[in-house]
Amino acid sequence: ASWTKASDLSAFNEDALSEYRMHYATPEHIHATCNDYRAGATYDLAADVVDHAAQRKIACPTLALWGTAGIPSETEGPLETWHEWCDSVEGHGIDSGHFIAEENPKDLLAALIPFLDRHAH
């Protein structure tokens, strides 16, 4: 719960908690989750290094959102980081911790819907 703004599970209803628990209840789920993080630190990182060296950027419009009570807000600036990787990026912090959808769905939708409306083709 330390990843939530309130440092507890109050943002999660019981159905959501049950869903999370179900997905972390078996060795296979835990293994898959660990492999996802492992790939991010190895294969994905290696591909990112090559792309960055070749000055390749994400070409589609990109929306970057982060919780203002989370680690990204403690860095130099999440949006500035994404500008290095994207041709067109916009975004801002949302009053939440790591779990934006659960902690502040109203502000998440207020950011997502206009972005998607502007870029729907």
Language model segments and positions:
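Short secondary-structure boundary segments
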Residues: 3-12, 119
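Catalytic active-site module of serine/aspartate enzymes centered on a nucleophile-bearing elbow/loop
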Residues: 88-121
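Non-transmembrane alpha-helical segments in soluble domains
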Residues: 1-3, 21, 34, 38, ...
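Conserved serine/cysteine hydrolase catalytic core
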Residues: 8-85, 90-93
